[in-house]
Swiss-Prot record:
It comes from the Bacteria. It is an enzyme of class 3 (hydrolase). Residues 164-334 form the Helicase ATP-binding domain. This is RNA polymerase-associated protein RapA. The gene is rapA. HAMAP family: Helicase_RapA. SMART domains: DEXDc (SM00487), HELICc (SM00490). The keyword Cytoplasm does not apply. Keywords: Activator, ATP-binding, DNA-binding, Helicase, Hydrolase, Nucleotide-binding, Transcription, Transcription regulation. Residues 490-644 form the Helicase C-terminal domain. Its EC number is 3.6.4.-.
């Protein structure tokens, strides 16, 4: 190679050294100094792995003093280059910069610069970059983006609500599905969509204290959302890091009590600029016009400051119209300001519900009914649609559906309230109760008697709680020497049941963690029964492992022993046998226990086994739950209300179970109240609201579309390719499970989303639902999203050289494959990617500028190519550099044409969709006051900003591959 002192070269193998300068040479070697790092390198003069750095007219270069020069002319004298052009900071022309004075920290970012500087990537990285661009663009445009990545079953009514609400600007809604229908999942789906699209960045979740960990686990396990749990200790710690402790985290969970208890803390919460507020168990927010509770006022303060609000409640409005109004008032105080007016409005919705029922029944409508429909819809030119709906012609069904949609858009609280009931949703199993009456051991009788004498001063409630758990009373007296499990008949029954049903998975729930741990030891030591334990003293990872062991079909645990608190938020639908070793204190906890198995999607009827000891509080409670509330075999929305009504009487019977006088009458009273309340609920069901919340065929089609996407294998192929190139080890464990671990030769030392000790992943939704230790990998999973960012935000794969062995073409024929990206810059909340995500435009040009890309598909072409090592590649580039420059100029003109077409199409689509949505809501605003002014203003503002951003869209060369034809 012809070296001269002062020339600038770059290392092919250590490009991070920057620009090198020739400082010494002899007949056989050359020494380069790399000023950016202060290092020297000694190379052989012949065949050294370095590339001469030469710039061309039109390029912009930087001097060692920091100013930039746009090159007009390049001169060579005695082997050294001098660049003449315009200095950009002073606009001085005819400025000369000698190559020895170039900035040594020079970074080549353009693909063509990297190619000419010898920074040549491996061929497989170029292919990965193009695939990443293509797949990313496709995923951004998916209409159900944000709904596929969660570890949940594809349940239509949940998807319908999430799809509707998740795309709104700052949604303010009340989610009031019945228990077991998945409100937490719906809220999580909405959050996931809003965070993924950039519509929201800061989220606050406020829940009762007992549900904090359940939400923390649910958000992480199902949605890969890492929330920070704030309590007194965390709040104090965070005060050292920021004036407002809540600004130290983007996603926060705290309890309602924590938020309400301290005035300064509430002020900090209100000032923390959240985008979304989620409040669970919102029916506990007590309100009356004269005396709202402190809890209600705290949430009211937050709701006034936070743009988006999701309230979750399982209590239907019929059990308290005033509290229902209070919750709606939090969402839109200007709309729901007068309780009396609200009650009157609700009465007026009955004709609308009747009209919907008529349309859905498919019966012919009378003229009177047609007139009523016309009046309710209030649209001009509605007559033809009404006539079609009332005929036998094609399209009658579609016309009826359109009329139903119009009615639902215009009336009721359907935009702010969503409520699904078990009656309206299919897919729930039956519940069958098996009670097992067992004798009370003499040891317990003695312990209870002594406890009664010693605890005479205890409150009735404390005595009642003690009487529910006789093993605890006995153990307190006996201490460490007590072995209640040796004589408690429930233990014998449980062992017998498990040994005679070895093939069945059984979930056992008891009130205390200590009971679960003792039972595990007994089952293991006496019968060799494989039992996993699950309690609040375990970490989330330990609970995951226990749940995973229980879920394994062949070698897994037969039984999972859970404490009351430990089982919160976990669902085990693959099991259908539930044993309640004891009974919980109130109906809500009973429903929560059964709800671990009784979920939508459960494939089998649920067998509920309740072994109880006669003459104890257990025998009282089992009768009250079953005969008084029918709470074992059916969900019991009335349970809490009746429990509160008869609380003192019930406590008295539980505290003194031997006293049964009047208990039958109490059960009869409770049953009558239960039936009356149930009838009241059924009569007051808002069919219109249920139809809207359920989503019908539209929701079913959405679920099927996502299921189809789940079956697409392109993600698996891409992910494996990505993991290989990034340097992540993959170990196939069978059963559709893969273990990923970091390797010593990764592209980055710490791959975001991959733990140091690795993780187990699956691409199968069913496997992910049964194996909580496995992460469910989709296009929306952090591993894939971070992988795409890693490849596309840097220059990985942006320049490469390949050989094409093809005897039909002359040796040395040049082809250049160009990948341009058309993109627009805009704030994330505008969700510009719906219309114009970063979109790749691929071209395959010959020397004359003919584009062969349409005839030569990428993957087919890629398989025909072979790699070139970097050193040989640099030589090839130097030989054909002028030709490549010429082809690049031809490509630029073609890229502009393609880019303009994409941008114009995106503008048309954005204008059409956003204008249509704005027009629809403006028209509805006249007849439905539930459409907020700020929502209309936001859509209008968004439309203008989106159009402005698309006007400024641009394109750039993202990757380049030089292909040389060979016959060898």
């Amino acid at each position: 190679m012809p070296f001269t002192l002062g020339q600038r070269w770059i290392s092919d193998t250590e490009s991070e050294l920057g620009l090198g300068t020739v400082v010494a040479m002899d007949a056989r070697t050359v020494t380069l100094l790399f000023p950016a790092t202060g290092e020297n390198r000694l190379y052989a003069r012949s065949d050294s792995p370095v590339t001469r750095v030469m710039f061309n007219p039109g390029d912009t270069i930087t001097s060692h003093e920091g100013w930039q020069l746009q090159i007009d002319e390049v001169k060579e004298e005695n082997g050294l280059l001098a660049y003449t052009g315009t200095r950009l900071d002073t606009e001085e022309t005819a400025v000369t910069l000698r190559e020895v004075l170039l900035d040594s920290k020079l970074v080549f970012s353009k693909p063509q610069d990297r190619l000419f500087a010898g920074q040549i990537d491996r061929m497989d990285r170029f292919a990965l970059r193009y695939r990443a661009r293509k797949f990313q663009s496709e995923q951004y445009r998916m209409p159900w983006s944000g709904l596929r990545g969660q570890r949940t079953s594809l349940i239509p009514h949940q998807l319908n609500i999430a799809h509707d609400v998740g795309r709104r600007h700052a949604p303010r809604v009340l989610l009031a599905d019945e228990v077991g229908l998945g409100k937490t999942i719906e809220a999580g789906m909405i959050l996931h969509q809003q965070l993924l699209s950039g519509a929201a960045e800061r989220v606050l979740i406020i829940v009762p204290e007992t549900l904090q960990h359940q939400w923390l686990v649910e958000m992480l396990r199902r949605f890969n959302l890492r929330f920070a749990l704030f309590d007194d200790e965390r709040y104090t710690e965070a005060q050292h890091d920021a004036y407002n402790p809540f600004e130290t985290e983007q996603l926060v969970i705290c309890s309602l009590d924590f938020a309400r208890r301290n005035k300064q803390r509430l002020e900090h919460l209100c000032d923390a600029q959240w985008d979304l507020l989620v409040v669970d168990e919102a029916h506990h927010l007590v309100w009356s016009e004269d005396a709202p509770s402190r809890e209600y006022m705290a949430i009211e303060q937050l709701a006034e400051r936070v743009p988006g609000v999701l309230l979750l409640t399982a209590t239907p409005e019929q059990l308290g119209m005033e509290s229902h109004f209070a919750r709606l008032r939090l969402l839109d105080p200007s709309r729901f300001h007068d309780f009396e007016q609200f009650v009157e409005e609700q009465k007026n919705y009955r004709p609308v519900a009747d009209a919907v029922a008529m349309l859905l029944a498919g019966n012919k409508l009378s003229n009177e009914e047609l007139n009523m429909l016309g009046d309710l819809i209030g649209e001009q030119d509605i007559e033809p649609l009404l006539q079609t709906a009332n005929s036998d012609r094609d399209g009658a069904q579609n016309a009826r559906q359109e009329l139903v949609s119009m009615l639902m858009d215009r009336h009721g609280t359907s935009r702010v309230l969503f409520r699904n009931t078990r009656n309206g949703v299919k897919g729930f199993p039956k519940r069958e109760l098996h009670t097992i009456k067992l004798p009370l051991p003499t040891q317990y009788q003695t312990a209870i008697k002594v406890s009664g004498i010693m605890g005479a001063r205890k409150s009735a409630e404390d005595r009642a709680r003690d009487m529910l758990y006789p093993e605890q009373i006995y153990q307190e007296f006996e201490g460490d020497s007590g072995t209640w499990w040796n004589f408690d008949p429930r233990v014998e029954w449980l062992m017998g049941h498990l040994t005679s049903h070895r093939s069945q998975k059984v979930l056992v729930i008891c009130a205390k963690a200590a009971t679960a741990l003792q039972l595990e030891q007994v089952l293991r030591e006496r019968e060799g029964i494989r039992a996993a334990v699950f309690h609040e003293g375990m970490s989330i990872i330990e609970r995951d492992r226990a749940a995973a062991w229980f879920s394994e079909e062949d070698s897994g645990a037969q039984v999972l022993l859970c404490s009351e608190i430990g089982s919160e938020g976990r669902n085990f639908q693959f099991a259908s046998n539930l044993v309640m070793f004891d009974l919980p204190f109130n109906p809500d906890l009973l429903e929560q226990r059964i709800g671990r198995l009784d979920r939508i999607g459960q494939a089998h009827d649920i067998q509920i086994h309740v072994p109880y000891l006669e003459k104890t509080a257990q025998s009282v409670l089992v009768r009250w739950y079953h005969e008084g509330l029918d709470a074992f075999e059916h969900t019991c929305p009335t349970g809490r209300a009746i429990y509160d009504t008869v609380y003192h009487d019930l406590i008295a019977y539980l505290a003194t179970p031997e006293n049964t006088d009047g208990f039958d009458a109490l059960i009869k009273t409770c049953r009558e109240q239960h039936e009356a309340l149930k009838a009241q609920l059924e009569q007051g069901r808002d069919r219109l609201l249920e139809i809207h919340s359920n989503g019908g065929e539209k929701a079913q089609a959405l679920a099927e579309s996502i299921e189809e996407q789940d079956d697409d294998t392109s993600l698996i192929a891409f992910a494996m390719n990505l993991f290989d190139i990034v340097g992540i080890n993959q170990d196939d464990r069978g059963e559709n499970l893969i273990v990923l671990t970091p390797s010593d030769h990764m592209l980055v030392p710490d791959f975001p989303g991959l733990p140091e000790d690795g993780c187990t992943i699956t691409f199968e939704r069913d496997v992910a639902l049964s194996r909580e230790d496995a992460q469910f990998v989709t296009w929306e999973h952090p591993l894939i999203r971070n992988g795409l960012d890693l490849i596309l935000s840097g220059d990985t794969g942006s320049s490469t050289i390949s050989l094409l062995k093809n005897k039909a073409l002359p040796v040395g024929t040049l082809l250049v494959e160009l990948v341009y990206v058309v993109e627009a810059q805009a704030p994330k909340h505008l969700q510009l990617n719906r219309f114009l995500p970063p979109t790749p435009v691929r071209m395959l040009l010959d020397k004359n500028g003919n584009n062969l890309a349409a005839q030569v598909e990428f993957e087919t072409f890629n398989r025909q190519l072979s790699a070139v090592n970097r050193h040989t590649g640099s030589k090839l580039v130097n030989a054909v550099q002028q030709d490549v420059h010429a082809i690049l100029q031809l490509g630029e003109a073609q890229a502009e044409k393609s880019a303009r077409a994409l941008i114009d199409a995106a503008r048309s689509e954005a204008d059409e969709k956003l204008s249509a949505e704005l027009s629809r809501l403006e028209a509805l605003r006249a007849v439905n006051p539930n459409i907020r002014d700020d929502e209309l203003a936001a859509i209008d503002s968004n439309r203008q900003q989106v159009m402005e951003s698309l006007d400024q869209a641009n394109w750039r060369l993202d990757a380049l591959r030089l292909i040389v034809v060979t016959h060898q």
